[in-house]
Structure formats: C-alpha cells, structure tokens
A protein has these predicted regions:
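...captures the hydrophobic TM-helix bundle architecture rather than a specific catalytic motif
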Residues: 1-204
Length: 204
C-alpha cells in the first residue's frame, strides 16, 4: 500500500539542510537585518536632506550598478555550465563574475570620490554619511563572496588538469551545493545593492 509523503514543515526542512547551507542562510538573514536597520535609520535621518543642494547621484554608482547586474547574469550561467559538465565555461563564468565584482568595488571607491568632490563627506549631513556607510558595508559583504570565488577558481584550474578531479567535481553533490550557494549569495548581494541604489537615487 502506497503512502503519500507528508509535506515537511519549515523546521524539518531546516534540519535537513547541510551545515553550510544553514550557515549561509542564517548569515544572509543576519546581514539582511543589519541592512534593514541601517536603511530604517537612513530613512529616519531625513532622506531628502540632499535635495536642492545641486547634487546628483555619482556616475560611478550608476556604472557599478550595471556591472553588478551583469555579474548576476554571469553567476547564473555558472550553474548552467555546471549542469552541462562544461568546466572551462564554468571557470570562465566564475572568472567573469569575480572580475565584475572587482570592477564594481573599484567604482564604489570612485563614487565616494565623486561624493567628496560634491562636498558630501562622511562626517557631514546624516544622509551623506549613510551613503558611505551602506555602500561600504555592502562592499564588505561582497568581498566574502569574492574571496570564495578565488578559492573556487583555483580549484577549477586544478580540476581541468586532472580527469579524476573533474569527475569528482561534476558528480559530487557537495560541489554542486557549493556552486549553488555561491550564486545564491551573489544574487542576494545584487538585490541588496539594487535596493540601496534606489534609495540613494531618492535621496538626491
């Protein structure tokens, strides 16, 4: 007699997660709460304090947003190439994602320079201070993913030189999970920045 499988509760699904998955999701939850708290403080500090001061959103922030959106696309391609067992394309997509992350970070510093040239300093108006604080904390979180990307790149480089390692990579559920978690976290960082960028536009 066949028994219908009862749906698992959210707690049971949580218990069945790999420890790495649990850590990542809890970390994302914690990071999300930090950003929610800071965004709330940003809003209560007076979102329109910079209005009427002849300021504009830094061009570097605009370009960096495009770079991060593009990196989200390349991160998505990683999972597709892994499913195709195409390691060279997987490595290329990961490398492109990493490089776009580096470009994004450099452009963030350029954006801070533009803010300073406009007279918006970290110790000036509260709204101006939050522009630095929120974007800086976002960079800090993104750096963690970029460090992990370097580790994955080194692993993939060794894999291409060893057929056994390649076989293990494409058949090991743990390796599949690591790539999936990387893309999940990267897209999370994309989403956080897009929300911040929208608020930054409103502040000007």
């Amino acid at each position: 007699m066949n028994r219908t499988k009862e749906p698992q509760t959210w707690l049971q699904r949580l218990e069945n997660l790999h420890p790495y998955e649990t850590l990542l999701y809890l970390g994302m939850l914690g990071s999300g709460l930090i950003f929610v708290f800071l965004v709330a403080a940003f809003l209560f500090s007076g979102l329109n304090q910079l209005e009427g001061l002849n300021h504009r959103i830094p061009v570097a922030f605009l370009i960096s947003t495009f770079m991060l959106i593009l990196s989200g696309y390349t991160a998505t391609k990683m999972r597709l190439h892994y499913q195709e067992e195409n390691i060279p394309k997987l490595e290329r997509a990961l490398r492109n994602t990493f490089m776009l992350g580096v470009i994004f970070t450099v452009l963030q510093f350029a954006g801070w320079k533009e803010l300073q040239d406009m007279g918006i300093n970290f110790r000036g108006l509260p709204s101006g201070s939050f522009l630095y604080l929120l974007s800086g904390i976002h960079i800090f979180h993104l750096l963690g993913a970029m460090i992990f990307a370097v580790i994955l790149l080194l692993q993939l480089r060794k894999t291409q030189e060893d057929g056994i390692r390649k076989l293990i990579l494409v058949t090991n559920p743990f390796e599949k999970m690591r790539i999936r978690l990387f893309t999940v976290y990267w897209h999370f960082m994309d989403a956080v920045w897009l929300i911040l960028f929208f608020l930054f536009i409103l502040s000007f």
